[in-house]
């Protein structure tokens, strides 16, 4: 499994599928879901030649279960940590429910 450590020390799980030089689509799940909820969409876009990424937001799925940091500022910072770790530039961000709020705060 793949993880990145955020600036405040939280372990965030991520999926990163596809060619590293392909256009990137980054998926953000809703509450109380996980990255797995995007698998069908990720498989579709992977088949179309995209690099697809999804995370389990802090406190969800395989990411570290923490009591604090459950706000849009931390979620956006967590996204930035994954983007930096993976060296992503120019990604399209797609969010559902709370994930949409994360996208709005991040961009």
What are these regions (language model features)?
Residues 1-11:
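N-terminal cap/lid segment of alpha/beta-hydrolase-fold proteins
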Residues 7, 47, 51-94, 98:
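Active-site loop/oxyanion-hole signature of alpha/beta-hydrolase fold enzymes
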Residues 10-65:
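Conserved HGGG/HGGXW glycine-rich cap/lid loop of the alpha/beta-hydrolase fold
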Residues 39, 76-80, 104:
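Generic alpha-helical structural signal
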Residues 100-107:
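Short glycine-enriched nucleophile-adjacent loop
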């Amino acid at each position: 499994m793949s993880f990145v450590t955020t600036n405040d020390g939280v372990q965030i799980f991520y999926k990163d599928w596809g060619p590293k030089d392909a256009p990137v689509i980054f998926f953000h799940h809703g509450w109380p879901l996980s990255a797995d909820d995007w698998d069908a969409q990720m498989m579709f876009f992977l088949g179309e030649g995209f690099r697809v990424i999804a995370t389990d937001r802090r406190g969800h799925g395989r990411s570290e279960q923490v009591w604090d940091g459950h706000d849009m500022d931390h979620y956006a910072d967590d996204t930035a940590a994954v983007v930096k770790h993976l060296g992503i530039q120019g990604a399209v961000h797609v969010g559902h429910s709370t994930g949409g709020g994360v996208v709005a705060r991040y961009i």
